[in-house]
Amino acid sequence: MFTDKETHRKPFPTWAHLLHSEPSKQFVFGNWKMNKTLTEAQTFLKSFISSDILSNPQIITGIIPPFTLLSACQQAVSDSPIFLGAQTTHEADSGAFTGEISAPMLKDIGVDFVLIGHSERRHIFHEQNPVLAEKAAAAIHSGMIPVLCIGETLEEQESGATQDILLNQLTTGLSKLPEQASFILAYEPVWAIGTGKVAHPDLVQETHAFCRKTIASLFSKDIAERTPILYGGSVKADNARSLSLCPDVNGLLVGGASLSSENFLSIIQQIDIP
């Protein structure tokens, strides 16, 4: 672990600057989930960091490794344009919570942002909206950016309940944040994650526009306009461009396709910048 964090501070724009700058920036985050050993991560980053594709200042790239790789990845990306994310956090700062990791711990090792409420956390580990609200607040208070993940199941989508589900997830999940908080939203329809099914760009745009309107009602029009809203769900190089062309899509949350540096770079290369 570094003893002098100032000497390893990334020489790139801060999160606050990125989230308050022009809205044309696109964010592309790769969620590794429960994958990669240390050796595999080192191999990935060696080829990934050296790519010229990452030189576009309008595209903000982040990787989200498992907890065991965060420190090593932080050292590897500290002098690169790549930001570091965590897959979840506990809502408490410390305590008798065996197996958990807190937001201050993540911030201490250089994590920039943290996923809150990924669909696998919601549906496999039964994380509920009120707890996710506490986790989002914990991330903010520790100096990280929460990426609140929301989405509906296939049954909910087919019954026409998508907007009701998302409204509840947004209203509760963001309820503990300060009025001027900076956060990122990720819409990931559960039926599209890891299934090969991709939401049609028209549906994605409609849903993202609804989310932005909801953020405006919960916070302000200004915050809604500057909040990046990402799409996640079977994102690949052959659909990344069409998704990024949606006016209210500000980036992509990539799952399995981000495990290969070649595939992930191909996706980033397809991102459309106005």
From Swiss-Prot:
Pathway, per record: Carbohydrate biosynthesis; gluconeogenesis; Carbohydrate degradation; glycolysis; D-glyceraldehyde 3-phosphate from glycerone phosphate: step 1/1
Top-level EC class as recorded in UniProt: isomerase
Residues forming the catalytic site: H118 (electrophile), E188 (proton acceptor)
A single GO molecular function term of this UniProt record: triose-phosphate isomerase activity
The enzyme's E.C. designation: 5.3.1.1
Keyword Nucleotidyltransferase attributed: no
Alphabetical keyword list: Cytoplasm, Gluconeogenesis, Glycolysis, Isomerase
GO biological process: gluconeogenesis; glyceraldehyde-3-phosphate biosynthetic process; glycerol catabolic process; glycolytic process
Annotated binding of substrate, by residue: N31, W32, K33, G194, S234, G255, G256
GO (cellular component) term, any one: cytosol
Major subcellular site: cytoplasm
Domain of life: Bacteria
Reaction equation(s) it catalyzes: D-glyceraldehyde 3-phosphate = dihydroxyacetone phosphate
Pfam families (alphabetical): TIM
Subcellular location: Cytoplasm
InterPro entries: Aldolase_TIM, TIM_sf, TrioseP_Isoase_bac/euk, Triosephosphate_isomerase, Triosephosphate_isomerase_AS
Quaternary data: Homodimer.
PANTHER family (alphabetical): TRIOSEPHOSPHATE ISOMERASE (PTHR21139:SF42)
Family: Belongs to the triosephosphate isomerase family.
Function: Involved in the gluconeogenesis. Catalyzes stereospecifically the conversion of dihydroxyacetone phosphate (DHAP) to D-glyceraldehyde-3-phosphate (G3P).
This protein's name: Triosephosphate isomerase
Species in which this protein is naturally found: Chlamydia trachomatis serovar D (strain ATCC VR-885 / DSM 19411 / UW-3/Cx)
Gene it is expressed from: tpiA
